[in-house]
Amino acid sequence: MKKLLGLVVSCRMQKTVIVEVKTQVKHALYGKRIMKKKRYAVHDPEKKASLGELIWIRTCRPISKTKKWIYDSSANASQSSR
């Protein structure tokens, strides 16, 4: 099961939020570090995530054509519990 940390950029749909995940990759030839970002449709059945919040998402069975990730927990809540 994969887990990713991302930022909620849209929460207009019912039970779905769009999360943007940023990763740093190294260029194969030149070695420069490049920031890449990808947007995931995430299933959020209880509507816990809010716009601009950092959340953890994890893989799950395909829920629809684009939704293969599910809301796991808020990154802010997990940091405060440590």
From Swiss-Prot:
Report the main location listed first in the record: plastid
This protein's UniProt keywords: Chloroplast, Plastid, Ribonucleoprotein, Ribosomal protein, RNA-binding, rRNA-binding
Q: Which GO terms describe its cellular component?
A: chloroplast; cytosolic small ribosomal subunit
**Gene Ontology BP term (one):** translation
Q: Where in the cell is it found?
A: Plastid, Chloroplast
Q: Name one Pfam family in it.
A: Ribosomal_S17
Q: Does the keyword DNA repair apply?
A: no
Q: Which GO terms describe its molecular function?
A: rRNA binding; structural constituent of ribosome
- What is its biological role? One of the primary rRNA binding proteins, it binds specifically to the 5'-end of 16S ribosomal RNA.
Protein family membership: Belongs to the universal ribosomal protein uS17 family.
Subunit architecture:
Part of the 30S ribosomal subunit.
Annotated protein name in UniProt = Small ribosomal subunit protein uS17c
What species was this sequence derived from?
Cyanidioschyzon merolae (strain NIES-3377 / 10D) (Unicellular red alga)
